[in-house]
Amino acid sequence: MKASQFFISTLKEAPAEAALASHKLMIRAGLIKANASGLYTWMPMGLRVLRKVENVVREEMARAGSVELLMPVVQPAELWQESGRWEFYGKELLRLKDRHDRDFCMGPTCEEVIADIVRKEINSYKQLPKNFYHIQTKFRDEVRPRFGVMRAREFVMKDAYSFHADYASLQTTYDAMYDAYCRIFTRLGLEFRPVAADTGSIGGTGSHEFQVLAESGEDVIAYSDTSDYAANVELAPTLPLKGERTAAQAELVKVHTPNVKTIESLVEFLNIPVEQTLKSIVVEGENEGEIVLLLLRGDHEFNDIKAEKLAGVKSPLTMASPAAIVEQFGANGGSLGPVGFAGKVYADFATEKGADWVIGANEDGYHYTGFNFGRDAAEPEFVDLRNVVEGDESPDGQGRLKLARGIEVGHVFQLRDKYTQAMNVSFLDNNGKSQIMEMGCYGIGITRVVAAAIEQNNDEKGIIWTKAMASFEVVIVPMNYKKSDTVREAADKIYAELLAAGADVLLDDRDERAGVLLNDSELLGIPHRIVIGDRALKEGNVEYAERRDNEAQAIAIGEIVARVTASLNA
């Protein structure tokens, strides 16, 4: 492709609202243009990258046995009402009416649509299993669209859905799709980790996220420094501490702590280590009027997903009201503890072996020092209540945990019968008995993959595309293409030979200054660059550089095509 026939629109500066490197570079490189908050046009250069990602995805979906179809963006409300998600999904679901006053929505996912198709088309175990996928535009009415296409309202996703006669079949397909995702992200040249994850609003049981490692990632993942264990930090379990409890050394003493309502202010006021403090979280119990007290170390982060699964705790997790707290404890938040509390108490594993804690005294403006479980209050039930921290023992018993930030680009779920039961997606088994199908779903954020790749592959000059994702594999930058016959002839010859060799080449024949052409080639991140100028041609050479290291080399003009094609095929 010649640049004069293509469309290149680059900027020297990124818009002020762009925070992430990917957002800045995608705007500057002209990959996307903003139309409204969270809405973008994919320009020709960006669309080429998007199609490269889609091609890899399609190839690996076919290899995994998934069949492509295309479902609508606009979906009828009755399907969502049938599954129960019409109200549950909330304001992120963009609802609309047609001219006949019928309700529809812009689909953020397609579980309901595919379930409806399958229940109408498949009725026998002989037709199972089946695995379908599509690549389609989605819409979620985000409250605060931000970070460019990383969290846009409109985006492109690959969704796959599988249907099965039994769980064993679902597990087989789940494993195959998991492997396919690993191949996809490996082929795209991304550094990633598959991690055990929570199922969230999609529902179901087994779940894995595929996280591209990047400092700008919103998610935190925990992984073993020894084994292959990895999980989202919200799901990684902590283990009970080993050994005996530290012997109590101090007496229980009530101390006056005026205006001390946070762990930070408590540590400062008493001049104690934060690890010696306990914080109290009060949540509603399953039964009306009941509350449950949760205790964890002051320096640890409370995990509401784990807490919600505890026996006797209301689901969804609901914090107790200030009035209920005062009624039960006689004090306000910031001064609470287990002494004298008769209700259910859970304490985190990390507190079980400790002694002489500092805890709220259930009187405003007072705390206890020297608090010990079993002596000053009944032994609580010790459970996992917190997020893991770096250095914790790996849940598989192998090594210690490390933490890294990641960007979720894919997610696979074992939905089981969450949707098939609600929508009566059934089949006749080999005994002629009606059974509910097992279901899996598997998503990849195609547009998000592009942004995540840039977050992982950029420098001060611009994007550094991986081999599989580059808009073009090679850019030819001729100096004075319009004015120098020698340069133009050499550029056209190399361009034709590279095209004949099957390379994806951009010949930048724009009538621009050399600095503009060179800067744009670096900003656009094309992996291989050939610069052609009169001076080098007089010596029989062209200048060649790979974008990742930017080390320019003089290569004989007769050898450049072989050199580049060898690199492309490596």
UniProtKB/Swiss-Prot annotation:
Any matching Pfam family: tRNA-synt_2b
A GO molecular-function annotation: proline-tRNA ligase activity
Reactions it catalyzes: tRNA(Pro) + L-proline + ATP = L-prolyl-tRNA(Pro) + AMP + diphosphate
Enzyme nomenclature, EC number: 6.1.1.15
Database matches in InterPro entries: aa-tRNA-synt_IIb (IPR002314), aa-tRNA-synth_II (IPR006195), aa-tRNA-synth_II/BPL/LPL (IPR045864), Anticodon-bd (IPR004154), Anticodon-bd_dom_sf (IPR036621), Pro-tRNA-ligase_IIa (IPR002316), Pro-tRNA-synth_IIa_bac-type (IPR004500), Pro-tRNA-Synthase_IIa_type1 (IPR023717)
Keywords: Aminoacyl-tRNA synthetase, ATP-binding, Cytoplasm, Ligase, Nucleotide-binding, Protein biosynthesis
Keyword Cytoplasm in record: yes
Location in the cell: Cytoplasm
A GO biological process held by the record: prolyl-tRNA aminoacylation
Broad class of the protein's primary localization: cytoplasm
Entry similarity comment: Belongs to the class-II aminoacyl-tRNA synthetase family. ProS type 1 subfamily.
Complex and partners: Homodimer.
Record-given protein name: Proline--tRNA ligase
Organism from which the protein derives: Neisseria meningitidis serogroup A / serotype 4A (strain DSM 15465 / Z2491)
